[in-house]
Amino acid sequence: MMQPTRRATLAGLGLTIPTLAGLSACGGGTQPSGGGGSPSSLSVWALTGAKQDTYEQSFNAWNEANPDNEFSMEFFANDSYKEKIRTAIGSGNAPTLVFNWAGGTLADYVANGSVVDLSGKVDEVLGRTIESIGLVGQVDGAQYGVPNNDTQPVILYYNTALFEEHSVTPPTTWDELMTAVETFSSAGITPISLAGQSVWPELMYIQYLTDRIGGEGVFQKAMAGEADAWSDPAITSALESIIELVDAGAFGNAFGSVSADAGADAALVHTGQAAMLLQGSWVYGTFKQDAPDFVADGNLGFLNFPAMDGGAGDPANVVGNPANYWSVSADADPEVQELAIQYLNEFNLNQEMVDSFLAMGAIPAVAGLEDSFAGLDDEDFLSFAYDMVLNAPHFQLSWDQALAPAPAQELLNNLSRIFLGEIQPDEFVTNMNATLDA
């Protein structure tokens, strides 16, 4: 069962619009060797991928202005970073700025005294961010995290050329999705690319399906630690729908060997081997980086997740994460902490970062951007994703970030086994209910 501190913010981190307009970015690439942070000097770790250049530019700008107090930077692939930061936090060797997803993990950092209270110290940067996204960085009303990049809804991408070639309607309902799966599968095309090796992309299916079928309150019961919360019929129905997709060949036969870190899931779409991809908005940057002509030629379409006939959830609801966050390590010397806070106020999400994010097709977690997209190469996508977030009646933080680390890992383990056909929904429910008593 989760500690009360992990449920204190924004109704258990199930985020409601208009109280939230916001969105787990994940990077691709290779892992450098990396070392622990020093308490006496500024250091930062972040993710490889499309946004790495923006972070490097920001910290280099700080370094040029502060040559006696420079940041050392290291970048890691998403899955490698999560393992490395867990070890560094536990050993007291975290970098000065701790890259995180808020939610249950940040609450654990707070409970263990691993990060510092930033309340009243980062008002300058919070003043330019979307207020509700800034609130996600709070634990028990105190500010421990500051948004550092873009809002990230989970979006259904599709290869428009393949849809036109096979006369398939972009799916806005579950029945239309299953029809598309059947058509593409019969044509020898993988209907939906899925990075099953990374496992966390599979969460997007159970999150959206549970919300579409049962509404946002279903997961809130699990967040609140209610007995047998995972026995809700909507969760069982969501799992049955996942099995329906797998059995229909929606993900092909090799999804268990596809990695999101390497961008292989997006590559299957832009090379025409797969028709669709359910992934976060950050993957748009991957498409632009790896297949610029594919994007420029209008071959990438995007939709919200399809509605479920008779479902209790609002089809405009969104899942994902509000943004990523910087927290300041409690292990750093006090004067180093103050320098990190100065960076956050003066350089983080400033105009230069905003312009850089917009240029790559990412939406910074900054207020008042509605008129900023006109004339940009990525205007259609930026407007779609920004409106998707702002107009969502409810936005659910990704379950693996909303939950504490132990039940989150159990969730990932059991969900992977569902996709691989190793367990049935009743076994998943039993296993997850057991985490409520742990």
Residue map of PLM features:
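Conserved N-terminal structural module of periplasmic/extracytoplasmic solute-binding proteins
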Residues: 2-107, 335, 427, 434-438
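Short helix-initiation/N-cap motifs at beta->coil->alpha
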Residues: 75-84, 103-104, 174-178, 255-267
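Extracytoplasmic/periplasmic solute-binding protein
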Residues: 144-147, 154, 178-228
